Amino acid sequence: MIQEKFKFYKPCKLLQPYIRYYWVFKSNRPLDAFTYPIGCPQIIFHKQAPLYIPELNVTQDKLTVSGQVNFSSHLYADGNTEMIVVVFHPHAMSMFLNIPTSLFYNQEVSGYSLENKSLNELATRIFDCENNSICISYVEKWLVSQIADNLADTTHRIKRIDAAIQRIYITPQISVNELSSIASLSKKQFERLFHSFSCV
C-alpha cells in the first residue's frame, strides 16, 4: 500500500523570528520531484533514505545543512523516505550554527562535517525516536539552547538585518546605502553583517 504524509509545524513564539516552520515528510514510494528555491536555509534530518540532487551531483547526508540556492532542482529517492526539516528565515541560521550562512550558498553540507557536538547529539536523538512530534520538540529545545547565551546581542543584530530585508521585499531595487541607513550602520558594517546572516 502506498503511503505519503506531509505535515507542517509552527515554531514556538520565541523561535518565530528565526524559524519559518518545520515540516515532516514520510513516503514509502520512490520520489521524483522538481523544486523551486525558497530563499531559506534548512537543516534536514533523514530518518530513512536521503535525497539525491542531480544538479549538484550529491546525495544528502542523514544530517544535512542545505544553504540558500539560486536554482531549481530535482529531488530523487528510491523510496522509504522520512525526513524532518527545519526551515530558517533567510538571515537566521548562522546564529544557531555559529557559521556564516553565506558559506552554505548553493551547497548541501553534511551536518557531521561541522563538528558541532550538540547538533550531532540532536541528530542521534531524532534518529532514535519514532514519534516525529516528539522529534520536533527535541529540535525546538536544541534551537532555544543555542540562542540562550547570546540572545540579546543576536536579537538586536537580527532586527537590524530584518528591517533591511523587509524593505528589500517592498523595494527590490533599493541601494545598499539606503539599506545601511535603515539598519543604522555604515555601509561596510551593514555589508559585513548582512553577508554573515544571509546570501540574498
Segments (PLM) and residue ranges:
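Alpha-helical bundle regulatory/interaction domains
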Residues: 1-161, 166-177, 182-187
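Extended amphipathic alpha-helical scaffolding segments in membrane-proximal extra-membrane regions
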Residues: 176, 193-194
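A secondary-structure capping/hinge motif
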Residues: 194-200
